[in-house]
Amino acid sequence: MKKPFYITTPIYYPSGKLHIGSAYTTIACDVLARYKRLMGHEVFYLTGLDEHGQKIQTKAKEAGITPQTYVDNMAKDVKALWQLLDISYDKFIRTTDDYHEEVVAAVFEKLLAQDDIYLGEYSGWYSVSDEEFFTESQLKEVFRDEDGQVIGGIAPSGHEVEWVSEESYFLRLSKYADRLVAFFKERPDFIQPDGRMNEMVKNFIEPGLEDLAVSRTTFTWGVPVPSDPKHVVYVWIDALLNYATALGYGQANHANFDKFWNGTVFHMVGKDILRFHSIYWPILLMMLDLPMPDRLIAHGWFVMKDGKMSKSKGNVVYPEMLVERFGLDPLRYYLMRSLPVGSDGTFTPEDYVGRINYELANDLGNLLNRTVAMINKYFDGTVPAYVDNGTAFDADLSQVIDAQLADYHKHMEAVDYPRALEAVWTIIARTNKYIDETAPWVLAKEDGDKAQLASVMAHLAASLRVVAHVIQPFMMETSAAIMAQLGLAPVSDLSTLALADFPANTKVVAKGTPIFPRLDMEAEIDYIKAQMGDSSAISQEKEWVPEEVALKSEKDVITFETFDAVEIRVAEVKEVSKVEGSEKLLRFRVDAGDGQDRQILSGIAKCYPNEQELVGKKLQIVANLKPRKMMKKYISQGMILSAEHGDQLTVLTVDSSVPNGSIIG
């Protein structure tokens, strides 16, 4: 019997309308839930809303309604969106649910009694929008008065911070730091994709894991601490516990918790909240003596050509506008096909419409149309019996499908959807090629080979049946439409799937309907841009014709050949320390793909007072500079590249998934 499978999205913070970023996470979890069900697992899929906090209280006040009314309205809208996206969740939790609040209060008192929570005072820079405290060194930008004193700043998210000093209860994270590191070593695959775990250890644990403020007294919209009700439980204990309370943890009926928490547990989150799920959540589970989840998947973001989505930029994409215009399946397909594992993906209207036309309409839609039409034309709509090796091309088609099915399952288990879909489209491409190879229109002539023609039709129908099965977790409507045109019932099982299993004496529809009509590229691209509020960018505007401009450079112009002599590589920071006797220099040990680490000295110490935040980062370095001796005793082999504007300096980094030693250029 297969283990029960538990999959969760993060619970979303309902302070505004959800865009395709939240839709991505929810669809990604839905795809996995549907796949696991088709593979024979009992699945519990959880999503929901994180409804407490200062920002909600403020938003409600601005709207002239109570916080409860505000979150009730938001919950209604979010549920409607998930219905539109056909999300097959088993439970929608809200942190304002009575059962959840009762368990949160009880857990807080339990941890207080066992001295894992203690009362203290917190002072620090706080972002209301992020519901998070920051140290000065973590701020993206620092504001100072005329005396040089810090008076404010900007969080990494871009939101402004304010100084907060108040009595607070603290969670003893520091007590569990060694145990957490040991857990990471035992379970190196716990955080995916690879590289994310090292970021957490280097950036947050090795510099010294600080205890976490877990209560607030400056607002009231939250779960009151029973023994000290002027405090409300701060967001992360409240929010993270949803994964357990939704299953019945701490309640009279805990059958689902006993079943699914002891099965396979997967959490999927955006990379921006990985720290809370990879550090706070495991430690909270340790405090409660509960088993650890099996996998924590931190995906990248969908961004636009001009950066993150922003209403002010006119580049926000909401799922409703795409579903209403193009249908649900193209959106689900595009989101799952276009975001590389471990990296960010770029949304463009051109790419969206292009994938519909070329991959869905041309590749898949035309294959179905041609197959159904030929079976009707040559065999009166009845699919001939499947036989092996009826033509010289059957064996290769079968081998390709078997190999791609194995790849598909491997990538689905790894939650690598782009590669899983690539395997499916390899089957589709090979089947389209099979039509050209076998030339059924020639076999159908009077002097043709009817037995070979029958084998071709059977193989085409069988291949499409395979495709309909493997796309079902992604595109339910398309899968059902293909099966219906082939005369088959909807897909209900994926655990056993073979090309030769096409049912005998099956009759296809008399006339197939295109499942993806071709789109007018220009018109549909303009539609998306207009919906995004980017009316200035539609294609009717005068095309930009670039002209040669006068170069504004602080240095002499160089030739391409001169630049080509410079080798820029990706290098991971293994260690960094201040250089004794110098206020400017930092000493780096980096892995630049040389087979052994190299040392680089860089004069950026004043810009990085907390130099340990650079450990684990992947930087860009000039790798082929002639080594030079510095401070009489250090050899520096390379240069760390940075961007400088005014008195601000930032080292240039790359995504953590890029291998060390990769050439940039």
Swiss-Prot record:
Q: Which residues bind ATP?
A: K311
Keywords attached to this Swiss-Prot or TrEMBL record, sorted alphabetically, are: Aminoacyl-tRNA synthetase, ATP-binding, Cytoplasm, Ligase, Nucleotide-binding, Protein biosynthesis, RNA-binding, tRNA-binding
Q: Does the keyword Transcription regulation apply?
A: no
Instruction: Work out whether the entry's keyword set contains Cytoplasm.
Output: yes
Q: Name one Pfam family in it.
A: tRNA-synt_1g
Lineage, top-rank taxon, reads Bacteria
Quaternary structure annotation from Swiss-Prot or TrEMBL? Homodimer.
The Swiss-Prot or TrEMBL record describes its family as follows: Belongs to the class-I aminoacyl-tRNA synthetase family. MetG type 2B subfamily.
SUPFAM superfamilies, sorted? Anticodon-binding domain of a subclass of class I aminoacyl-tRNA synthetases (SSF47323), Nucleic acid-binding proteins (SSF50249), Nucleotidylyl transferase (SSF52374)
The UniProt annotation puts motif 'HIGH' region at 12-22
Q: What InterPro entries has UniProt attached to this entry?
A: Anticodon_Met, Met-tRNA-synth_bsu_C, Met-tRNA_synth, Met-tRNA_synth_2, Methionyl/Leucyl_tRNA_Synth, MetRS_core, NA-bd_OB-fold, Rossmann-like_a/b/a_fold
Task: State what protein this is by name.
Answer: Methionine--tRNA ligase
What GO MF terms are annotated?
ATP binding; methionine-tRNA ligase activity; tRNA binding
Report domain tRNA-binding positions: 562-665
Instruction: Show the GO cellular component annotation of the record.
Output: cytoplasm
Q: Which organism is it from?
A: Streptococcus pyogenes serotype M3 (strain ATCC BAA-595 / MGAS315)
Q: Where in the cell is it found?
A: Cytoplasm
**Residue interval(s) of motif 'KMSKS' region:** 308-312
- Catalysed reactions, as listed in the record: tRNA(Met) + L-methionine + ATP = L-methionyl-tRNA(Met) + AMP + diphosphate
> Tell me, which GO biological process terms does this entry list?
methionyl-tRNA aminoacylation
Membrane-traversing stretches: none
Q: Matching PROSITE patterns, A to Z?
A: TRBD (PS50886)
Where is this chain primarily localised?
Answer: cytoplasm
Q: What NCBIfam families does its record include? A: metG, metG_C_term, PRK12267.1
**What's this chain's function?**
Is required not only for elongation of protein synthesis but also for the initiation of all mRNA translation through initiator tRNA(fMet) aminoacylation.
This entry's Enzyme Commission designation comes to 6.1.1.10
